[in-house]
């Protein structure tokens, strides 16, 4: 069952999620839309809140999301992108700059990085796990492992805690 209109990244396997989890997925999709279509933050947030979150689109029901969480992620990523992108770049291997990643993967990493930085009240393991699950919904290859490794490295840098990975390089 496809819950995203044509032309947008679509998850492979829908997963039962809480309202924050749905907000994270919607935020990644909105950030993707902004990146690919050049849509502004106010426009995309208004579109999702009016026509997508908890609504029926093309015969498919979107799950309810926490609209404040959704707004915070999207607006936070936009506001902090010039700080987040270099941090993500540092967490990637030298031969994989952020610009080489596709728009969906960049959106997932930016949202996860922002949440690690801005939402210290949310446990690192929850953030990393949620964004790995989002990556698994869109990818079947190594991308979820990449999301796990990058967010784990960022958690070490941002929060001083990690599940084992160390930053790969410094530039």
From Swiss-Prot:
Q: Which UniProt keywords apply?
A: RNA-binding, Transcription, Transcription antitermination, Transcription regulation
Does the record's keyword annotation contain Repressor?
no
Where on the tree of life does the source sit, at the highest rank?
Bacteria
The entry lists its GO molecular-function terms as: RNA binding
Q: Which GO terms describe its cellular component?
A: cytosol
Pfam families, from UniProt? Answer: NusB
Record's keyword annotation contains Transcription regulation? yes
- Which segments cross the bilayer? none
Q: What is an annotated GO biological process for this record, any one?
A: DNA-templated transcription termination
- Provide the family line: Belongs to the NusB family.
Q: What does this protein do?
A: Involved in transcription antitermination. Required for transcription of ribosomal RNA (rRNA) genes. Binds specifically to the boxA antiterminator sequence of the ribosomal RNA (rrn) operons.
Q: This chain belongs to which protein, by name? A: Transcription antitermination protein NusB
What is the native source organism of this protein? Brucella suis (strain ATCC 23445 / NCTC 10510)
Q: What's the name of its gene?
A: nusB
